[in-house]
């Protein structure tokens, strides 16, 4: 979280840094919120112990690396919020920060790309021989660069629940026993990306 902490607007943005992967709270009682130091501190930082009326921040943004470990951390954080503070999600306060996957540059211009399509377009626009950097984690992005990703041009994906989505069913599907239904879902929705150096 070093780059985010150094580049944030201290008047409007706060950073809560996790130490490693959070606990999988699926199926646990709310006592874990008080017993687990990370969860207890997060609850206190957001001021949501007694509900959302005193919520300190309108947007709770989950920022992780864009790799498998980062996706797992996102899932664990969403599990925590859905398990114990579902209204935080239902009322539209939880977001995922999009961070660039690539930097494509030539001597005149730098483009940050959030998808393979954007990378290919940038290579085409900045040819003949642009330099391409693949970001593997948030720590590889300097604070000066990061400032542009969390300022006015911030790209966020809001975490939404449809009215017909039952929280217990969602958590059971994604975090419960490894069923054939979930295995088939993963296989059918798996995206394999090339590692571009």
Spans of model-derived segments:
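Conserved phosphate-chemistry cores used by DNA topoisomerases
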Residues: 1-197
């Amino acid at each position: 979280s070093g780059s985010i902490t150094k580049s944030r607007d201290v008047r409007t943005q706060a950073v809560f840094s996790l130490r490693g992967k959070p606990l999988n709270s699926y199926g646990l009682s709310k006592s874990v919120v008080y017993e687990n130091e990370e969860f207890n501190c997060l609850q206190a930082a957001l001021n949501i112990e007694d509900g959302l009326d005193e919520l300190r921040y309108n947007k709770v943004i989950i920022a992780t690396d864009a790799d498998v470990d980062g996706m797992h951390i996102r899932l664990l954080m969403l599990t925590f919020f859905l398990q114990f503070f579902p209204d935080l999600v239902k009322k539209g306060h939880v977001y995922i920060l999009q961070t660039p996957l690539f930097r494509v540059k030539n001597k005149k211009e730098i483009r940050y790309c959030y998808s393979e399509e954007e990378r290919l377009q940038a290579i085409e626009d900045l040819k003949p021989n642009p330099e391409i950097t693949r970001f593997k984690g948030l720590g590889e992005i300097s604070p000066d660069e990061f400032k542009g990703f969390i300022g006015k041009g911030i790209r966020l994906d809001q975490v939404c629940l449809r009215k017909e989505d039952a929280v217990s069913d969602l958590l059971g599907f994604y975090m419960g026993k490894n069923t054939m239904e979930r295995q088939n879902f993963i296989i059918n929705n798996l995206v394999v990306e090339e590692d571009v150096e």
